[in-house]
């Protein structure tokens, strides 16, 4: 067998078989859009990569958490919003154990370390600290994020799933306010192995900034429309963090000669959780070649196990049969790949719609039609939650609720770009 181009037989392991014997936590599948192509011409093949989190950490015991809650307590959070956040924080504390590490930072004009990073051995005392959180004045997001980063990185990160959850209801109004400085902080935390998730509360925060924080930090972006949604948002984050089976995951590609990867692909992956699947759609351009079975792509995922502290690897090959038949490239496309391509188109349409609304480039009729079309496409491809979000955004558009509309659509776009399914609802 030619290890670089031609395959005289299929590899001796199926796609998705982990590349290392000590890597049961992750699997990788490579699904080609079409398994045949015309040998005599240049061809384009879509390949759907599925990174699957399987099983549980070793012995079924979850990985300890190193969790930091960074909470906005500016004046606009006074009343029901801050009360709901306090209750959600106490609910988080109740689910942690003595092997977990928790820190809590609040910010307004000034920053307070409510709880320095420590093991959760006295949840009642921690809850009492949380009850003392009261509203202040302005919003110093930069310093709050910095202080949270200091806490979460003050303990050895090996052996923990480290996560920082940021919640704010407004724009930065004190301290450093420029997005570039804020995102540099997040980038540094991510490089140290800390996942940063961002929650925006109410109608007044900058949704694009919060989504960028989550994207840079490898975490989740959540839009919380009202106080009644706070508890569920915190629970989703906690459940996901408790289910992590692989961290620091990176997607890698090996392309044999005469094959090229089209477009840009984000190779940094979010933490992989048990029961979740992360999808990435790539396009391979192949030049003319002789007939036979060829590998057009070898993909692998390198990660780290927070449970065993050992490296993980999973790999898979994309295989195409090149035949001397002009119609070989017109075979029906794999349904899963077709669905992934449909999702990609839906995301592009949604981004176009959002930008058009912001610049008032589309009429109300055009916007409604575009949103309805995107909703239908999402429903057809099984993304029921995202379809419901677009339906909610459509109602907001029709009633003139621009803030809710934009924040909802940014959240939907973020979820589609993340490409993750399964896990906590």
Model-flagged regions — what are they?
Residues 35-36, 267-272:
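Beta-strand-rich interaction surfaces with strong enrichment in secreted/lumenal proteins
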Residues 245, 249-250, 254-257:
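Membrane-embedded alpha-helical bundles of multi-pass transporters/translocases
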Residues 48-50, 282, 299-302:
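OB-fold and OB-like beta-barrel modules that bind single-stranded nucleic acids
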Residues 286-425:
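Long, acidic serine/threonine- and proline-rich intrinsically disordered regions
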Residues 2, 20, 29-248, 287-290, ...:
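Exposed acidic/Ser/Thr-rich ligand/metal-binding surfaces
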Residues 27-29, 257-267:
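Short beta-strand and strand-turn-strand segments in soluble, beta-rich domains
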Residues 273-292:
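Low-complexity, intrinsically disordered segments enriched in Ser/Thr together with acidic residues
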